[in-house]
Amino acid sequence: MVKTRYLVAGSALAVVVVALGAAASYTANGLPPLPQASAPTASAAPTPTAAPGEPRPVGFAVVGDSITAWAGQEAGSWTSYVGSDGLYFSGHGWARNGAPLAMMEANTPRLDEDVLVVLAGTNDLRSPVALDDRLDVVDAIVRRSGVDRVLISAVPPFDPDPRLGTAWNAALREHASGAGYAFVDPWSGLRVDDGSFDPDATIDGIHPTPAAAERAAEPLRSAIIAAAG
């Protein structure tokens, strides 16, 4: 069964919904699905409070696909590793296995976190939609969220055709600069020279291993804190 995880705004805790669908060998975008796991049981922690005299912790929300949602396998998501004393994942936003950009835009809720992290586009790499039109959807995601401080993340290597991932990441970087978004490439240490994954860092040439997700969380953590100002 294909399991998908949603991150839903609107409560003090994250609400996680697991939807069951017909079994399939590939997603609608031609990408292999994630290995399946049981439904997640944990919710995000309540918003932490700062001790007297200490700065308020930075909260962030996310919009993404399986790189973030990981079909309930918490150890595979970078969000499991990015928190620190001064930073926490609110559990809000939206992420789903196999989601293309248009689906993310349609489901992005209104948010009030300090920073929005958008890690998106892998499921559109083989799309005939022009790069500029895809970037317009990224902007629409940001507008729907209502968050002022935005961090755009590069997508991981895409071994079926590394050139597609490289081109999308270059377009994201340039667009972020012009739009006033922060940008981070947390996967730079997990690629080899042709732009594909280090073989030890991926389960399938598209998704990182849990250890690779943990490595990617380090630059993401620094970039989120910097984006918060």
Across the structure, where does each feature detected by a protein language model lie?
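Oxyanion-hole/transition-state-stabilizing segment in secreted/luminal serine hydrolases
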Residues: 101-135, 155-158
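Serine-esterase "nucleophile elbow" of acetyl-processing enzymes
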Residues: 26-97, 102-112
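Structural motif
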Residues: 59, 115-117, 149
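Active-site-proximal beta-strand/loop segments in catalytic clefts of secreted hydrolases
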Residues: 63-66, 94-97, 119-123, 153-158, ...
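N-terminal export and membrane-targeting signals
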Residues: 1-16
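Catalytic His-Asp segment of secreted/periplasmic serine-dependent ester chemistry enzymes
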Residues: 13-16, 21-26, 162-229
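Active-site segments of SGNH/GDSL-like serine hydrolases
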Residues: 122-123, 142-169
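Extracytoplasmic/secreted cell-surface and envelope-processing proteins
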Residues: 71, 125-129, 159-166, 193-194
